[in-house]
Amino acid sequence: MLPFNSCVYVLLIISLMSNCRALCRATALQGRSLCATGGPDAAFRAEHERLSAFESRPSSGSYDMRRALEPIEIETWFHIVSGETDADLVTDEMVILQLHYLQKAYEKASISYRLKGVTRHINETWARNGDDSAMKKALRRGGYSTLNVYFQTNLQPPSTTDFARWTSDGDNRHAYNSDLAPLSVLGFCTLPDPSINSSSPRSSYSKDGCNVLAKTMPGGPMTHYNRGGTAIHEIGHWNGLLHTFEGESCSEDNAGDYIADTPQQSVPTDGCPSQKDSCPDSPGLDDIHNFMDYSSDDCYASFTSNQLKRMRDMWFSMRKGK
């Protein structure tokens, strides 16, 4: 675990942020030629519908007020998984910057992340996601309410032909073609599972957590995707959010992400356009600055008010005390 002295931590963050350009080794991203999202199951959609109805009703008193104001602190573990040739890719400074960005991104939701520890492992198979189940069985810490993030230096799907099958298990993933590999993924993460309760065996949630390409951490070599935004996006899924373009349709019967204040959006955003309107007959422009779109890191800026509320409600409903 990194020793975080608060004063040193703040000074180091200021220094590192000012020198971030010097830390970044440029690697061109050629664009996401393949974006695949495993859809949420019926039980998870039903929970979103229930919470939508819950959030739209008038407040019923002190319980609702306490739930709305109670700070949420999530125990968190970072696991750095590297291959032999890139064992030094992820520095302590990159870990600190990623944690800082994580805290800032979620502070308006009164959600904070208490880093319990950082583990480091050199394993060629795990680094490329060759055996996700074995890796998580060996490395995962804590209960269902504990966030585990696996930063892998060469995160890939098992094979191009298996990608559709690989994305059909309810995880949310986004992918790209790059000069680093024929097909790589920026990250994927599990959504909360309504069937998990406080007495569920550890084996029932052994794969819970977020897998993130380590090159997307602040100071990493992935140009346009090296400010740490991928981890923010994936942890949004862990907190229960769907993509802003969920359903990829402008149809009135498409519930989208079940969030009332995210405009209807039919396609993911690539890069950072000045503006975009994929559903011109629906109110509002695409929220290209939303962490739950597929925009580049320089475009990411915020969650909506209702997304912040939904993440809190998902925590109390799906993860707290489990």
From Swiss-Prot:
From the record, give the cysteines joined by S-S bonds: 272-299
Residues recorded as binding Zn(2+), renumbered to this chain, are 233, 237
Query: Where does the sequence pass through the membrane?
Result: none
Q: Does the keyword Cell division apply?
A: no
- Alphabetical list of InterPro entries matching this protein: MetalloPept_cat_dom_sf, Peptidase_M43
Q: What Pfam families does the annotation carry?
A: Peptidase_M43 (PF05572)
Q: Which residues are glycosylated?
A: 123, 197
- Annotated GO MF terms: metal ion binding; metallopeptidase activity
Q: What is its EC number?
A: 3.4.24.-
Leader sequence range is 1-22
Localization, per the record, is: Secreted
Q: What does it do?
A: Secreted metalloproteinase that allows assimilation of proteinaceous substrates. Plays a pivotal role as a pathogenicity determinant during infections and contributes to the ability of the pathogen to persist within the mammalian host.
| PANTHER family, A to Z | METALLOPROTEASE MEP1 (AFU_ORTHOLOGUE AFUA_1G07730)-RELATED, PTHR47466
List the protein's name.
Extracellular metalloprotease AFUA_1G07730
Organism listed in the record: Aspergillus fumigatus (strain ATCC MYA-4609 / CBS 101355 / FGSC A1100 / Af293) (Neosartorya fumigata)
